[in-house]
């Protein structure tokens, strides 16, 4: 009924690694800080990494205050331009994010190579969504008890527009965990939860795509090709 909350239908929702900054290891931020303070590079990064806490009470913002040449950029294009404008300085792009931000990084690396920008490099900290799911499903609890206390997964919208729904099929087939890809809007999420609950109640383990208006099974093949050309 309209008066019932989602909590009455769905017992518990556990937030996954939705934010690339939240899953960024401190050691990677420490390395970026060392590059700026000790190597004297121009470190380019997205704004949401500047305040991430690092070791010894530092952050990129505080390292900048200590004299590090750390610059916020809005895209890899900005970082490339900084490298062009500073041919005598080493420019490092601190690349973070899931599959959504990986293709622009790949394009930047290819562009730098095409232009012969030998002073441009990337500190790659991109992460993969299917690998994160695999890590959860292969956690110590699985080895100890033979199960993981999760009934299913709500697949991410933005990432899935790039990788498609195909990569999730492995988890449904091999682990018997249903996956429903949800869109961005509240109604998208509510519908995805309903679809997920129906699968659980019916004993099904399939990949369903609630966000069919933007996500296909194969995803963005051009973006995938760029990533495959650059990254292992």
Give residue spans per PLM region:
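Gly/Ser/Thr-rich loops at beta-strand to alpha-helix junctions
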Residues: 1, 18-23, 48-52, 94-104, ...
């Amino acid at each position: 009924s309209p008066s019932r909350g989602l909590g009455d239908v769905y017992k518990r929702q556990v937030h996954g690694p939705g934010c690339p900054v939240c899953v960024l290891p401190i050691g990677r931020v420490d390395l970026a800080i060392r590059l700026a303070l000790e190597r004297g590079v121009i470190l380019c990064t997205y704004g949401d990494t500047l305040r991430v806490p690092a070791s010894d009470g530092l952050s990129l913002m505080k390292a900048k205050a200590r004299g590090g040449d750390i610059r916020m950029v809005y895209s890899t294009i900005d970082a490339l331009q900084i490298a062009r404008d500073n041919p005598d300085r080493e420019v490092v792009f601190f690349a973070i994010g899931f599959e959504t931000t990986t293709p622009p990084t790949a394009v930047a690396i290819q562009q730098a190579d095409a232009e012969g920008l030998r002073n441009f490099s990337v500190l790659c900290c991109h992460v993969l969504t299917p690998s994160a799911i695999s890590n959860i499903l292969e956690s110590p609890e699985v080895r100890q008890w033979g199960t993981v206390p999760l009934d299913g997964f709500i697949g991410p919208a933005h990432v899935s527009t790039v990788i498609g729904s195909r990569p999730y099929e492995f988890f449904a087939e091999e682990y018997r965990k249903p996956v429903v890809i949800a869109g961005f809007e509240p109604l998208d999420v509510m519908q995805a939860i309903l679809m997920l609950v129906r699968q659980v109640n019916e004993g099904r383990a399939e990949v369903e795509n609630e966000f069919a208006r933007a996500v296909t099974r194969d995803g963005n093949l051009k973006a995938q090709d760029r990533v495959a050309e650059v990254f292992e």
